[in-house]
């Protein structure tokens, strides 16, 4: 009997070690698969318009803040717009590569901000799920604490993999609204609905239910990277008020172009000012 107990304890230790090893290996592998900062090369530097380092304790977190006048040099005081929007960029791009869709809003009096995830652009570190959350939270805190925005005047917009940190921020911090463009249910579920790993990075399907602000979701009807059905399912899980905008597009990266750039900016600006109107639900 004692021998059996000893054997069971040994087997239990082996199982625990295998699980721990699988977690470590799985995390490392999925980080390598998920993040591709090597393709994010928009060539900005510290002298680029609106660049600011919002890092603490000697760790650089590269951010860009434009507005309300586009192209304000960083040497001038960053003017406070009537509302701010945080753009959480996609995978194979950095923060400067994602601003093209929104930066004209700065001319209308809004503050447009973005941050690079760890390992992207000029941000220090290596990309991880938690690192993405941390940098986006830091930009939010910086806008509220340093620039004086009210939390309800900060909108967060996440594109593609950026839907993960955007949804996490909206689920854990008070914000004025959440915009998701071509979002996924979770990162691994883009490839398979079956959970193959002990981790499920960027679990939007679990977090969206905790979002209490207005939600706007856009998705290409024939998206060639993230299935349209995932954006639709995420919309069904979201709380009211919410709005779903299908876009006749098969290009994952060009939603604003296929929707119409001027229409897109009007849609975003209207959401920032008015949330979801009754007739838009």
Regions found by a protein language model. Give the residues of each.
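An N-terminal hydrophobic leader/cap segment in hydrolases
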Residues: 11-55, 61-73
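Membrane-embedded segments
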Residues: 62-142
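Short alpha-helix in the alpha/beta-hydrolase fold that links the catalytic acid
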Residues: 101, 213, 227-236
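Alpha/beta-hydrolase fold nucleophile elbow
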Residues: 149-159
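Active-site nucleophile loop of the alpha/beta-hydrolase fold
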Residues: 175, 179-188
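Short beta-strand/loop motif that positions the catalytic acidic residue
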Residues: 211, 217-219, 223
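Acidic catalytic loop of the alpha/beta-hydrolase fold
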Residues: 222-226, 253-254
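C-terminal catalytic histidine-bearing segment of alpha/beta-hydrolase fold enzymes
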Residues: 232-236, 240-281
């Amino acid at each position: 009997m004692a021998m059996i107990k000893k054997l069971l304890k040994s087997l239990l230790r082996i199982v625990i070690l295998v699980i721990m090893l699988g977690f470590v290996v799985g995390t490392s592998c999925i980080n390598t698969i998920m993040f591709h900062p090597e393709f994010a090369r928009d060539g900005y530097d510290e002298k680029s318009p609106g660049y600011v380092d919002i890092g603490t304790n000697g760790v650089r977190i590269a951010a860009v803040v434009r507005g309300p006048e586009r192209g304000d040099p960083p040497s001038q005081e960053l003017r406070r717009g009537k509302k701010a929007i945080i753009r959480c960029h996609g995978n194979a791009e950095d923060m400067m590569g994602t601003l093209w869709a929104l930066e004209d809003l700065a001319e209308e009096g809004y503050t447009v901000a973005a941050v690079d995830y760890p390992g992207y652009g000029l941000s220090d570190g290596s990309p991880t799920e938690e690192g993405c959350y941390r940098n986006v939270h830091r930009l939010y805190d910086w806008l509220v604490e340093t620039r004086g925005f009210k939390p309800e005047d900060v909108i967060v917009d996440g594109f593609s993999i950026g839907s993960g940190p955007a949804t996490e921020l909206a689920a854990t911090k008070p914000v004025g609204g959440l915009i998701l463009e071509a979002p996924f249910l979770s990162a691994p579920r883009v490839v398979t609905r079956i959970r193959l790993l002990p981790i499920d990075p960027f679990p939007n399907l679990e977090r969206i239910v905790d979002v209490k602000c207005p939600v706007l979701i856009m998705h290409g009807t024939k998206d060639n990277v993230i299935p349209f059905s995932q954006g639709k399912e995420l919309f069904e899980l979201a709380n009211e008020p919410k709005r779903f905008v299908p876009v006749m597009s098969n290009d994952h990266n060009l939603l604003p172009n296929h929707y119409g750039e001027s229409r897109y900016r009007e849609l975003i600006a209207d959401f920032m000012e008015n949330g979801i109107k009754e007739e838009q639900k």
